[in-house]
Amino acid sequence: MVAEAGSMPAASSVKKPFGLRSKMGKWCRHCFPWCRGSGKSNVGTSGDHDDSAMKTLRSKMGKWCRHCFPWCRGSGKSNVGTSGDHDDSAMKTLRSKMGKWCCHCFPCCRGSGKSKVGPWGDYDDSAFMEPRYHVRREDLDKLHRAAWWGKVPRKDLIVMLKDTDMNKKDKQKRTALHLASANGNSEVVKLLLDRRCQLNILDNKKRTALTKAVQCQEDECALMLLEHGTDPNIPDEYGNTALHYAIYNEDKLMAKALLLYGADIESKNKHGLTPLLLGVHEQKQQVVKFLIKKKANLNALDRYGRTVLILAVCCGSASIVSLLLEQNIDVSSQDLSGQTAREYAVSSRHNVICQLLSDYKEKQILKVSSENSNPEQDLKLTSEEESQRLKGSENSQPEEMSQEPEINKGGDRKVEEEMKKHGSTHMGFPENLPNGATADNGDDGLIPPRKSRTPESQQFPDTENEQYHSDEQNDTQKQLSEEQNTGILQDEILIHEEKQIEVAENEF
């Protein structure tokens, strides 16, 4: 099974990679990304762990390690970039046959020797690569086997629950609820929930049964767990909540249910990604649109200060960029390196995105200029007109106030002059009249003096004052008041003439 130094095993020699991996567990453990071919593995910050017993085996299979696993440096001669996309065409056949082995041995590897990284080469989606549990029958007891395979009659399962602890954990800290939820055995999940098992127990990845159900897209089990009160906001060791996994899987119905049961739409994982940022980074346009409708924060930043727009530009998704621009998002925001979305688009040569950003910026400039220019001019015109109108009203009011008294004064003067002319006759009524006329005025049928119109002359000032106070100070009312004054004066003259005639008749 082991190839000689400098040679590579044939593809036919690797018939059962899982069996080989189980036999060579130590080699698989140390030849992964931490291996440098020197017998030392850099795990954590505490120091190097030496496994000198594996030096010979690793040196003999150095090339195989180097070509099958691009991240592993096996013999120390392979220096690949940070993206981990080094490819050796001679090993394509071997890697294709050992794709499952690569996928399960390396969380970041999908069997093609490539890892999905972010714009800066720092992001990997290893948390999303192995949704289902890897279960070995010998590691499970009866209850866990029944929960995983779900082929046990209900009666037997009830007996198992009576005899054993339903919250018991296996070596990977998984309970029966974890296994049943991850594998979609809704009958077992329902029975465990009816028995009031613990809901928020964490496995070795700090995931709850709800997180595993959502991650494995077992919606029926996930809804049952939500209805019984499972917390949807418990993060796993990667910082992802159940909503992150629903967004990654583009499961809008599950995301809607999680939000309905109180999931935090702004929770961040260890990379500082909210569900919206994760959806943009993974180019999940439908769930991005869904989260925007649910009022997700468009100004959220990851740990490098990148916005959703910058991530969309870096990922080269013109459709998501266009969708974000429709929300009037800020295109001038910078990340921690001081770069904007447009600068990323130019450096990445995304011409379509550059054009979208340029058009959006021009529209914003035109909009701002139109809003700032026209309203100010209108305000200036209206303010000037208002000031002129106020000045005109202030100037016209004193003139009207001064003109009305003059009219009244002129009328009063005319009345006084007429009264002076006829004052002797009017005031001499008691002296010139004979005694009989004065005594028998009402009995002899003499023409009595007309008293019906004298009150009008006496009430003239009152009517003039009332008219003055009720006047609305316009030209038409001025003319009416003048006509009334002249009419009243004529009436007064006629009254005095009639009185003179009456006095003359009485004298004769």
Swiss-Prot record:
Signal peptide: none annotated. SUPFAM superfamilies: Ankyrin repeat. The keyword Protease does not apply. It comes from the Eukaryota. Residues 476-487 have a biased composition (Polar residues). ANK repeats lie at residues 172-201, 205-234, 238-267, 271-300, 304-333. SMART domains: ANK. Gene3D superfamilies: Ankyrin repeat-containing domain (1.25.40.20). Residues 377-392, 406-421 have a biased composition (Basic and acidic residues). Residues 369-487 are annotated as: Disordered. Pfam families: Ank, Ank_2. PROSITE patterns: ANK_REP_REGION, ANK_REPEAT. The keyword Transport does not apply. Keywords: ANK repeat, Repeat. Belongs to the POTE family. This is Putative POTE ankyrin domain family member M. It comes from Homo sapiens (Human). The gene is POTEM.
